[in-house]
């Protein structure tokens, strides 16, 4: 039995369109917005009752206002808030919009609905560009160069909000009417809203139902009835009057707090993790220096010509699986900024069955995830899709494909505020006043209040981070010249390795896992192993490529080293002093369930983003958003439990409790 909802639990909205072209939910039998004027209703119920015209105009540079919403629907409320923000707020202010939607509209329905509001065309076009690869869970969409962020939680609101880590400044309590959707309008919802609210948070809602008003008051909001809009005689507005201050139950995972005054950072390492970190910080107004020991970015693990968007999923709702789904969707949206065909290809990925254990695993995955993300194909259908003969079918990921990692790195580094410093090898770190100095062979390379270690396994080369349990695993790819017949391959094929359709006339094949060898020269043995793997994937493709295991000396290839952690999850977040950590939480060594409220001894301004292993194309881009959220105290782009599972302090905690 899997712990994910069955695939039928995820369902797009089913709409009926009336004679005026307005949408109505078939499931709930309710409208998405006022038939009189949805735009004016939004302005009155949500923008005005939350005092957003004044609040946006009063925002300071680098300030971020967070809006929470309980029903995304057509996106009308989001687009109206975004438009008002653009018109009213200072250029360096930011808007973060968190919304929940159980039944998202299909792209076609969203496009049709937004066409009703030509006044919002500028914002609507950007939303539609990013409205792809939306899957259950946390979805991060970025607009206006990072000035506007949408965190869309796809699922039931009563299941999504408890996992959210955010501080909401203004609430849009929206959704279908309480009489139409009573499952949502529960005391548990009002309690979660209070928990997530920043001090003095405001609230607007279209309903004036007495039980809603009483429930919000009981949760800590001061509520009042005010004149409604259109046929609504009254609506509700309110603000958080009282909330119970909660001590962090896991202080070792608590946010370090915003102690940095000057928004400058140094990122060590210009691979995908480092470039994504730099881009996320620059989008928030930080000035970032990226130190790279090579002549350019993406020269090591992120330097392969083709990286596959391969989703290694679990049917059991693991932290890694949630990270993979959220990360995949985010990467897929980023790739839309690159040149299709040259820098990436949305050709899909076909994961082939190769033994009975894999057959069972795939059956569980097909049941656990919606077909829009992954669906099974019998052999005949798989062959027709792939364009080559196969011995088995498998699982097809239609939104996946391959990408050229260096192109994504270069695009990420183009953001204003980022400086790439080449031929700068960081050898040491030292604290200097309120800043960190990064030292090289010739002295100080850079200095800033924040340093992010993003250099794969070399993140552990410094005294402050030497305890990080990182491991290097050699991987070799083989480059096979395409033939007229091999070029008919139309999708990425995966089994125990992968082969991609050609890029620049070459197929990428790989990659080996070599735990012993530590040099970076391609080996004949690993070329031969890659060719054997290709033959297992498709004998037909093997023959079309005229692959010859006796002529591997002539093959081109590339070696890089994956960086992994003991639990195969990345390390993303702030670093603590290991000795002081052990002292602060020593009681946990005697009783792991004991409540300890000591403040975590952070190494102020020192962060890490590494150990993405063979999933870098999936997890590294989103990791930049997660690290920036830790730094800027913004809503996390992943469920809290997933962020904790990626937190570096998990290893200090395990060592304390288990002694290992």
UniProtKB/Swiss-Prot annotation:
Organism in which the protein naturally occurs: Stutzerimonas stutzeri (strain A1501) (Pseudomonas stutzeri)
GO CC terms, sorted: cytoplasm
Cofactor: FAD
EC number of the protein: 2.1.1.61, 1.5.-.-
InterPro entries cross-referenced by the UniProt entry: FAD-dep_OxRdtase, FAD/NAD-bd_sf, MnmC-like_methylTransf, SAM-dependent_MTases_sf, tRNA_MAMT_biosynth_bifunc_MnmC, tRNA_MNMC2, tRNA_S-uridine_synth_MnmC_C
Record Gene3D superfamilies: D-Amino Acid Oxidase, subunit A, domain 2, FAD/NAD(P)-binding domain, Vaccinia Virus protein VP39
Reaction catalysed by this enzyme: 5-aminomethyl-2-thiouridine(34) in tRNA + S-adenosyl-L-methionine = 5-methylaminomethyl-2-thiouridine(34) in tRNA + S-adenosyl-L-homocysteine + H(+)
Region (FAD-dependent cmnm(5)s(2)U34 oxidoreductase): 268-660
tRNA (mnm(5)s(2)U34)-methyltransferase: annotated segments: 1-241
GO MF term set: flavin adenine dinucleotide binding; oxidoreductase activity, acting on the CH-NH group of donors; tRNA (5-methylaminomethyl-2-thiouridylate)(34)-methyltransferase activity
Entry keyword annotation includes Transmembrane: no
Protein name, as recorded: tRNA 5-methylaminomethyl-2-thiouridine biosynthesis bifunctional protein MnmC
NCBIfam families documented for this protein: MnmC_Cterm (TIGR03197), PRK01747.1-2 (NF002481), tRNA_MNMC2 (NF033855)
Family note: In the N-terminal section; belongs to the methyltransferase superfamily. tRNA (mnm(5)s(2)U34)-methyltransferase family.
Subcellular location: Cytoplasm
